[in-house]
């Protein structure tokens, strides 16, 4: 069966070719357009092909043409009929230049193919211009087989066949053009066609004939007749550009209830009479279960025979059953006011295992009428839903006759009509049992005991032998909470009670005839004892004192250990010192996935494979180097549904691209830290290949900061930097070098937690490049603004080069996403760094933070702080917020000369709006205009109160605008030199 399905798949998956033009089938002149109209141009001739059929051909042989001369041949307008990529198969012969006696240096053995798109047949003999633009070059075609021309003999040689690919096409049609620049050749035939995926039925899913418009096109399928979609995503398959269907469907369909798959899983067949299929799925039709039948084809359920039923909770495929017969051999044992009944199971259980029992009771007074039993009787464990064949009845009245009817029930008893069979038993109680005990009183109460007394009941005959006391705490439920006490006198003492608790008490008496019924519940309460409370307080005070002494001892021990640690060395504090970093015993070390002989083995070892049915893609949120980035949801069995980010691998990938795409997962899967993006798993067993990570609601840090410019306090920004440093400290301890640490590669969640990401690029330096940049494996260039100088010059990447990049990230955060080095070119950045220039402090940046940046930018990489020292320094700032109030001043005692980005003179701006956009406050342009601040003269007089009235409520934005206004005032003073005339940085 599987072989048959496989063969069916192979035959149906063949690509279809739709012909647009085939000159071998043309019988009349082609009349294609040539240019120029001179001797030696393309000439249309009639000839015979290999099968001796008449065909139209074009020949050209101008081997002594003037330099720059070209002969063009253009086909008629060809409608593309929905095709995006068109294939052109050329059959041609070409003479070898050496065999031509008159061939000059201009003789060639190649020709060029072009195409031109248009929405209608508008081309003329002169338009479009006969040149590469507007014509689009397809390829320069060289002959694989050359024909040799010997003197006095006919030319001999093989026919060349070449297939070219045109596109992508977007207009209604196109022309194909051939350019000859000195070849001697004959164009024997031209076949223009496009490929499409044939109609396909597989896995009970029908996919329509499809013309591919991309490398890989998803095609939605529809279920065949009497089939329904399987759980999960809608059925889909991928149509490749070459007209082949790619792999098996993502999901498929399954036959509806009452139908089974047939003919190689391509259609659904109705179940025959006497068979059924209860659910949709891959199963086949089954014979009807016991006591049921189906009289029609396509049955999803078999009907029960007369007298048989299915319970509502029974599956459709369950046998039909019947109610049980009556229980047998009921035996009664009477003990005063209590009765024990037990019986045997019925002869017929009805074919079910959910057998239960129930009792009905009637009581008859002496010489009186009968009625259903009252509520004073108790049944243990209950009057119905009994699993075991016994019950104890308590509270029987003396000298009463009781009739009990015991019935057996199962899951279909409620569906049956007619009387329910039962087994009766009659019991008459004695008249000598004592009556119920009442009038219970409390004679003494303490915190842990109650003393009770009651009146002696009058027994009809004989004396009371003893009493049974039943009591439990009020509110307590269940048999385990009830306690019993026997006493021979009409009093009792209940001990071991809770202080201040309420108890419910009942008493019954026993004579020679047995126990009488329990009387009414009596409510009693124990007392609260203050002396006992004082003792507890004393114990609490003593316990607290002991705990205090223990804490003092612990503090002393910790202090001694800290002093010893300080005496051994003080390099744990942040300083300029450097030393060798050693990985402690048991520390996990990063393993490069490319060291594996099979990189897929690294993916299997470090990343969890996720079933694609657990993944739901909701929307595309971006595009990455390898494909799209989406937001989706992950719902694994037994786990809570979570929001995830999904990276997909675009279609048409190579195996190398697939390995590099999945390498990020095998890297990420080795990390587990709250400030490192968490890998959820990978999908590699279906298309498209996916990497799933936790979803970070606020996206990349740089764009998030620019969007919220001025809305965070310094302490909040330092907290973000501390999280990034903590993640980098973890990576350094794992011996992993990031190489591309930048704010764009830091993700932020809804709680403002920053996490390091982007572990997927394998980077290398471009050779012989005048502007050194890092290039990814797929060609994406990475700016050098974040890269340490030794990494640029010597390709030396270490944790120290990551520390340099971290300093740039600090500058990005404190400037709310400003571009490092502004608009300077890469070469200018390199030159400035070589001359020891460094970035200045961002506006309102604390001095301590800018000094930490400068330490990270030390030219000697050994002098840069390591990440544990960076974390320690940031922790000190967070613990001492006052240190963050000292704001850095430009060139104020800096150890390096600082770059300067001067603001242009305000006269360089054409309007107030242009000025606002230049200082990145363009969001308030309309507010300024509405408030009447339309000139620089008015803006120069603006105050903080005016800004509030306009709607500038953020303190950071107010500072930025007022600082620029102050700068504007200084520029307007007489004798003050103007700005630089532009935003170009100076150093």
Swiss-Prot record:
GO terms for molecular function: ATP binding; ephrin receptor activity; transmembrane receptor protein tyrosine kinase activity. Changing residue 664 to K: In CMAVM2; the mutant protein is not detected by Western blot; loss of localization to cell membrane. One of its GO terms (cellular component) is extracellular region. Residues 1-15 form the signal peptide. It is an enzyme of class 2 (transferase). Keywords: Angiogenesis, ATP-binding, Cell membrane, Developmental protein, Disease variant, Disulfide bond, Glycoprotein, Kinase, Membrane, Nucleotide-binding, Phosphoprotein, Receptor, Repeat, Signal, Transferase, Transmembrane, Transmembrane helix, Tyrosine-protein kinase. Changing residue 516 to R: In CMAVM2; uncertain significance. Residues 976-987 have a biased composition (Gly residues). Phosphorylated; autophosphorylation is stimulated by EFNB2. A motif (PDZ-binding) lies at residues 985-987. Residues 16-539 are extracellular. Residues 965-987 are annotated as: Disordered. Changing residue 807 to R: In CMAVM2; uncertain significance. Pfam families: EphA2_TM, Ephrin_lbd, Ephrin_rec_like, fn3, PK_Tyr_Ser-Thr, SAM_1. GO terms for biological process: angiogenesis; cell adhesion; cell migration involved in sprouting angiogenesis; ephrin receptor signaling pathway; heart morphogenesis; protein autophosphorylation. Changing residue 95 to R: Reduces binding affinity for EFNB2. ATP binds at residues 621-629, 647. Disulfide bonds join 61-184, 97-107. Glycans are attached at residues 203, 335, 426. Residues 17-202 form the Eph LBD domain. PANTHER family: EPH RECEPTOR A5 (PTHR46877), RECEPTOR PROTEIN-TYROSINE KINASE (PTHR46877:SF19). This is Ephrin type-B receptor 4. It comes from Homo sapiens.
């Amino acid at each position: 069966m599987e072989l048959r399905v496989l063969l069916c798949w192979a035959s149906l998956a063949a690509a279809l070719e739709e012909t647009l033009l085939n000159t071998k089938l043309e019988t009349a002149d082609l009349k294609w357009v040539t240019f120029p109209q001179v001797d030696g141009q393309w000439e249309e001739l009639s000839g015979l092909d290999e099968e001796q059929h008449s065909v139209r051909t074009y020949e050209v042989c101008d081997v002594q043409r003037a330099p720059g001369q070209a002969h063009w041949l253009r086909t008629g307008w060809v409608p593309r009929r929905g095709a995006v990529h068109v294939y052109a198969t050329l059959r041609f012969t070409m003479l070898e230049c050496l065999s031509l006696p008159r061939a000059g240096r201009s003789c060639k053995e190649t020709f060029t193919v072009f195409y031109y798109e248009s929405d209608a047949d508008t081309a003329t003999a002169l338009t479009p211009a006969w040149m590469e633009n507007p014509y689009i070059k397809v390829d320069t075609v060289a002959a694989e087989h050359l024909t040799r021309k010997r003197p006095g003999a006919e030319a001999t040689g093989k026919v060349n066949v070449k297939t070219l690919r045109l596109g992508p096409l977007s207009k209604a049609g196109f022309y194909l053009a051939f350019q000859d620049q000195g070849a001697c050749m004959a164009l024997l035939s031209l076949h223009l066609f496009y490929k499409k995926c044939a109609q396909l039925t597989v896995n009970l899913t029908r996919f329509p004939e499809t013309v591919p418009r991309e490398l890989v096109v998803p095609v939605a399928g529809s279920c065949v007749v009497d089939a329904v979609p399987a759980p999960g995503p809608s059925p889909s398959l991928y149509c490749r550009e070459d007209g082949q269907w790619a792999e098996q469907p993502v999901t498929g369909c399954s036959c509806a209830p009452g139908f089974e798959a047939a003919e190689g899983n391509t259609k659904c067949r109705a179940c025959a009479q006497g068979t059924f299929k209860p659910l949709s799925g891959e199963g086949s039709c089954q014979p009807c279960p016991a006591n049921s039948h189906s009289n029609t084809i396509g049955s999803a359920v078999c009907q029960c025979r007369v007298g048989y039923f299915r319970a509502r909770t029974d599956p459709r495929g369950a046998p039909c059953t019947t109610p049980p017969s009556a229980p047998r051999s009921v035996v009664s044992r009477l003990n005063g006011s209590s009765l024990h009944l037990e019986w045997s199971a019925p002869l017929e259980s009805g074919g079910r295992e959910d057998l239960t029992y129930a009792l009905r009771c009637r009581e008859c007074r002496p010489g009186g009428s009968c009625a259903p039993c009252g509520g004073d009787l108790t049944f243990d464990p209950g009057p119905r839903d009994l699993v075991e064949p016994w019950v104890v009845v308590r509270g029987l009245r003396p000298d009463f006759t009781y009739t009990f009817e015991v019935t057996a029930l199962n899951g279909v008893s409620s569906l049956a009509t007619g009387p329910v069979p039962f087994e009766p038993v009659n019991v008459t109680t004695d008249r000598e049992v004592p009556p119920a005990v009442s009038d219970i009183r409390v004679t003494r109460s303490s915190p842990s005991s109650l003393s009770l007394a009651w009146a002696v009941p009058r027994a009809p005959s004989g004396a009371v032998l003893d009493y049974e006391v039943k009591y439990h705490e009020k509110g307590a439920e269940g048999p385990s909470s009830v306690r019993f006490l026997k006493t021979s006198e009409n009093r009792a003492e209940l001990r071991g009670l809770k202080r201040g608790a309420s108890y419910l008490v009942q008493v019954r008496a026993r004579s020679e005839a047995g126990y009488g019924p329990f009387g009414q519940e009596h409510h009693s309460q124990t007392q609260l004892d203050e002396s006992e409370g004082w003792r507890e307080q004393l114990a609490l005070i003593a316990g607290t004192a002991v705990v205090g002494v223990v804490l003092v001892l612990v503090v002393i021990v910790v202090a001694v250990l800290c002093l010893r640690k300080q005496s051994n060395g003080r390099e744990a504090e942040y300083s300029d010192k450097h030393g060798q970093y050693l990985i402690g015993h048991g520390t996990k070390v990063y393993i490069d996935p490319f060291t594996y002989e099979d990189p897929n083995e690294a993916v299997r070892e470090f990343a969890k494979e996720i079933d694609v049915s657990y993944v739901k893609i909701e929307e595309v949120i971006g595009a990455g180097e390898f494909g799209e980035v989406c937001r989706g949801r992950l719902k694994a069995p037994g786990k809570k549904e979570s929001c995830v980010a999904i990276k997909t691998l675009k279609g048409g990938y190579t195996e190398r691209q697939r390995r590099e795409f999945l390498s990020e997962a095998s890297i990420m899967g080795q990390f587990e830290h709250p400030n490192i993006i968490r890998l959820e798993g990978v999908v590699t067993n279906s298309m498209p290949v996916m990497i799933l990570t936790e979803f970070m609601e606020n996206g990349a840090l740089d764009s998030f900061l620019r969007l919220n410019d001025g809305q965070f306090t310094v302490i909040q920004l330092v907290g973000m930097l501390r999280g990034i440093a903590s993640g980098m400290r973890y990576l350094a301890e794992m011996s992993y070098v990031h190489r591309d640490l930048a704010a764009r590669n830091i993700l932020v969640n809804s709680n403002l937690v920053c996490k390091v990401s982007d572990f997927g690029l394998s980077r290398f330096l471009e050779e012989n490049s005048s502007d050194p940049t890092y290039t990814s494996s797929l060609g994406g260039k990475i700016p050098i603004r974040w890269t340490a100088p030794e990494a640029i010059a010597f390709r030396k990447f270490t944790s120290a080069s990551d520390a340099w990049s971290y300093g740039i990230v600090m500058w990005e955060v404190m400037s709310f996403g400003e571009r490092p080095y502004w608009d300077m070119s890469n070469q200018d950045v390199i030159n400035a760094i070589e001359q020891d220039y460094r970035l200045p402090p961002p506006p309102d940046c604390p001095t301590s933070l800018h000094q930490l940046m400068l330490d990270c930018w030390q030219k000697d990489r050994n002098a840069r702080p390591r990440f544990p020292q960076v974390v320690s320094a940031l922790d000190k700032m967070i613990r001492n917020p006052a240190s963050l109030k000292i704001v850095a001043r430009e060139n104020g005692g800096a150890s390096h000369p600082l770059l300067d980005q001067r603001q242009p003179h305000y006269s360089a701006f054409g309007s107030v709006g242009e000025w606002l956009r230049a200082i990145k406050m363009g969001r308030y342009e309309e507010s300024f205009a509405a408030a009447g601040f339309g000139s620089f003269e008015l803006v120069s007089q603006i105050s903080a109160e005016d800004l509030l009235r306009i709607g500038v409520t953020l303190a950071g934005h107010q500072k930025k605008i007022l600082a620029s206004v102050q700068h504007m005032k200084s520029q307007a003073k007489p004798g003050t030199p103007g700005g630089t005339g532009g935003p170009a940085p100076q150093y």
